[in-house]
């Protein structure tokens, strides 16, 4: 994705958040959920996450116990040491990263732990899941920094 495209979606996102919110509250949820996988595929034909990595720079995934176990093992760390080194408990008592950007994000926007990354990272930005429609607050938050979310929302709005 070119730099001008990144700037364009950021501008559109800020302008359209209110419109997206109204749309997500009125949408035919069942119909939208059925077409999300196609829109997801189309969006990721245009968008390369490595051009952006805004999710890794602005967002912390939740680290479930299975994630912690898997990642700690891959780093040859004890689970508790991994937690103490990288994680904190948030207001919902979920483990999240202590800092942003993600400490596993490399300079070229690749992930050091990609093969064992947390399930939230694997699923992000949820554009092919019912969560995208059923949790509009999450979708709107993600729209503030993810071009794929904006792309899927724009295409959904065209279909109605």
Language-model-detected regions and their locations in the chain:
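Short loop/turn segments that flank or connect secondary-structure elements
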Residues: 1-160
């Amino acid at each position: 994705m070119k730099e001008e495209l990144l700037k364009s979606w950021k501008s559109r996102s800020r302008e359209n958040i209110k419109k997206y919110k109204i749309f997500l509250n009125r949408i035919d949820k069942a119909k939208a959920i059925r077409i999300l996988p196609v829109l997801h595929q189309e969006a990721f034909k245009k968008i390369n996450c490595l051009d952006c990595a805004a999710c890794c720079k602005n967002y912390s995934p939740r680290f479930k116990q299975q994630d912690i176990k898997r990642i700690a093992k891959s780093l040859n760390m004890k689970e508790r040491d991994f937690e103490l080194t990288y994680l904190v408990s948030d207001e919902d008592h979920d483990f999240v990263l202590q800092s942003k950007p993600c400490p596993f994000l490399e300079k070229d926007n690749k992930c050091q732990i990609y093969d064992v990354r947390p399930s939230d990272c694997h699923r992000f930005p949820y554009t092919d899941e019912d969560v995208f429609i059923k949790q509009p607050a999450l979708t709107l938050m993600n729209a503030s920094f993810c071009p794929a979310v904006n792309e899927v929302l724009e295409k959904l709005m065209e279909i109605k």
